[in-house]
Amino acid sequence: FCRIRLQDTNYQEYHNYRILDSSSFSRCLEIYKQYVTYKKFKDIVPIFIEEFELPHSDVIGYYDGNDLVAFTLAYRFKSVNSVWADQFGWDYKNKKLSLGHIANKSECALYKRLGYNYYYLGESSDYKAKLDGYEISNFFDTWQN
């Protein structure tokens, strides 16, 4: 797993996002289906509506104009002052938005502003390694750091 040390970042929050409420959760599931279809994922991690409703979850919606086109499902863990970005989905109708990269940076800025130390992004990859503050997490050695 990789994570971002938020104190080492200086990103800005995206101008057109909102923390979503339950009225948008069905749309997020539609976006997720479009996302996995577009990406041609063969091994799909399911998302259940209850995940959106957990008290420690944030559903961050990204808009193109007034249209919800992408989201991140993230979990806040106060015990380690960290956030885990569990799921992302984007409908890819306007590829020029580059919302995957924008979401990563915007969420780093958001959670840094809220006082969190780390933003976990799941498995490492080349595009994640380009983010400021990137590091591989040796969880059992560092989970309280």
What are these model-derived regions, one by one?
Residues H15-K96:
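A conserved beta-strand-loop-helix scaffold within acyl/acetyltransferase catalytic domains
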Residues S57, A70-T72, R76-N138:
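Acyl-donor binding region in acyl/amide transferases
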Residues F1-D21, Y118-N145:
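Terminal substrate-recognition subdomain of acyl/acetyltransferases
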